[in-house]
Amino acid sequence: CLENQRSLCESHVTDCVPFYELLEVLAEEVAVSTFVNRVCRLTGRRNLCFFQNGHRERFMAMGEKCSRAIEEAATCSAVYLLSADRFLWSRALEVIDQEEIHFSKIHIHGVDLDGYVLFHMARDLYQGSRHVRLSELTDPELVSDRIFEWIMTACVIRRHGIRVLREEERRIDRSRIGQ
């Protein structure tokens, strides 16, 4: 019963709290200074870019194909990361269905370092595995700021579900109208 109350409470909080504040809460929970510092630099910009270079279109197309599966936080967060990289997406597209993501069928040969990190982080968020270490995430030579931003977005999606993206897009649309 308490778990149901927590979920309901988190649902209301997620719909009200700006995305960057959800990232700050995540950073506080991790409490490793290099991670906190990197998240703080990210949230200091306050204009996070959720989608660019066809990412939104690839993500939304999968949402239409697998509308039921994309509502699950684990699937949504993994699809968000897999669709961020055009080459990785071309490898993953055919192995995602209404039931699951078949990571063992995704052949990542030829993917660059960014795609490699996105693939393994997507698998970790989806399966609950731990292939990507925190020390790797905090190293800007291994994980670029753009990839780190997408990974942090996926972590918040994993925790709060697709409604985080929907609410943030509404917030962005409202700010554009107000300009």
Regions found by a protein language model. Name each.
Residues 1-111, 127-179:
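Extended, charge-biased low-complexity segments
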